[in-house]
Design a protein with these regions (language model features):
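N-terminal active-site segment of His-dependent metallophosphoesterases
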Residues: 1-71
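Extended active-site neighborhood of metal-dependent phosphoesterases/phosphodiesterases
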Residues: 3-10, 68-129
Length: 130
């Protein structure tokens, strides 16, 4: 098994404020009245926005299992809180993000397709003060 690593580089001209959250455990499918986990994620993101975070590390378990619906809900939560000014986001796969599909490769492929970056992405953030 070969892992392909990706590198993303960001330059910001302000103080770096990093927020770390994890375990939103979003539902893998649309269910009636299934909003608690989504609401908790939105609330957490709102707190990080108020604190001025310009980078967020999501440390695993976006969904309760690998699911396009959960990943779409995750991205929609960021958009609803931050609008077009979404901060740098590093999303890491947790153990639950590897459940639900037959192979871990399928889980990584879905994660990469829906989240927009590989779970093996290295981030470099350069802070420049004027």
């Amino acid at each position: 098994m070969e892992f392909k690593f990706e590198r993303k580089t960001f330059n910001i001209n302000e103080r770096l404020r990093v927020g770390i959250i994890s375990d939103s455990q979003l539902s893998p499918v649309r269910r009636k009245n299934e909003t608690t986990f989504r609401n908790n994620l939105v609330l957490s993101l709102s707190v990080l926005k108020k604190q001025g975070c310009n980078m967020i590390i999501f440390a695993g378990d976006i969904g309760n299992m690998a699911s396009g619906f959960a990943y779409d809900t995750y991205k929609a939560a960021f958009k609803s809180v931050f609008g077009e000014k979404i901060p740098i986001i590093q999303s890491i796969m947790g153990n639950h993000d590897y459940y639900g599909l037959r192979t871990s490769e399928n889980c990584r492929r879905l994660f990469t397709k829906k989240i927009g970056s590989s779970p093996f992405t290295h981030y470099t953030v350069t802070v420049s003060y004027t």
